[in-house]
Amino acid sequence: MLPMRYKSILLAFLLFYVSLAAFAAPGTMRLDYYHTGDASHELFSVDRIVIEPLPWPGDLTKTIDDTNLGNYFFEVRDQANGRVLYSRGFSSVYGEWITTEEAKTASRTFSESLRFPVPEAPVKIVLKRRDEGEFREIWTTRIDPKDKFIDSSRPHSPGPLLTIQKSGEPATKVDLLIMGDGYTAAERTKFENDARHFTEILFTRSPFRERRADFNVWGLCPPSEESGISRPSNGIHRRSPLGTTYDTFDTERYILTPENRALRDYASYAPYEFIEILVNGATYGGGGIFNLYATVTADS
């Protein structure tokens, strides 16, 4: 039998580890859905619900977005009492496409995603759109975290995670993920150098320069079969892992990707809040969507 003092020490250790478990970060849930419509109408449908490989990277004391930014806004509400557990404002590729001439005469479908901490009980997802300065509800769906059809399988790995700058634990820092597209396996070193170069340039500019210690910067680069990305105006088409392309919305230097599903699966192997897609190419181009991602060419 253990002496009383050893029992006390053992009990203290047990309580310590139980307290750690209680404050452990929850998993990361992602709702992938389809956004369909034209300049006048839009509708939504669930694609899949997944549990990403890594724990939730965000600050659990700052789950409510009160900035009133973005063209869309979503809330995760406790289904039992309606309490808002998580919210974020964002914009989307669809939201930009509906301003084009094509949207006046045709419909298109875009893949989109909402990420949030895995809830402990059933929740209601409420999606809102900005209308005359106010967010108005346009779609709802319900999620039971115990649903057997929630996909917890691990997607195809993009390769090793590159730590470019680690200033602290993800929950206490802003996590920026730099993703390479159009880099072959043989160009992995080039991606690493390009990502580090981009990081140094970013932190020479205000307000990033003054807040550098508040950031973690990570890198992922799924290998591409061919070097470079698509540029349809020059007759160049590539099947790059992230699907980035010039000529988005028939604007020659505008680079976005329609492949949201692939982007999110690859990105799930890093803790992130913001994504910068670094395109392997020398022709000037880039773009960005609020709270979605930004793109830039590495060598321009």
Which residue ranges define each predicted feature?
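Bacterial N-terminal signal peptides
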Residues: 11-21
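Short amphipathic, basic-aromatic surface patches that mediate peripheral association
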Residues: 26-65
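Extended low-complexity, serine/threonine- and proline-enriched intrinsically disordered segments
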Residues: 67-89
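Aromatic sugar-binding surface patches on proteins
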Residues: 93-113
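Short, aromatic- and glycine-rich surface loops/edge beta-strands on solvent-exposed regions
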Residues: 112-115, 119-133
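Edge beta-strands of extracellular beta-sandwich domains
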Residues: 132-148
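Fold-level signature of zinc-dependent metallopeptidase catalytic domains
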Residues: 147-213, 219-229, 235, 245-248, ...
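Short pre-active-site segment immediately N-terminal to the catalytic Zn-binding motif
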Residues: 188-191, 287-300
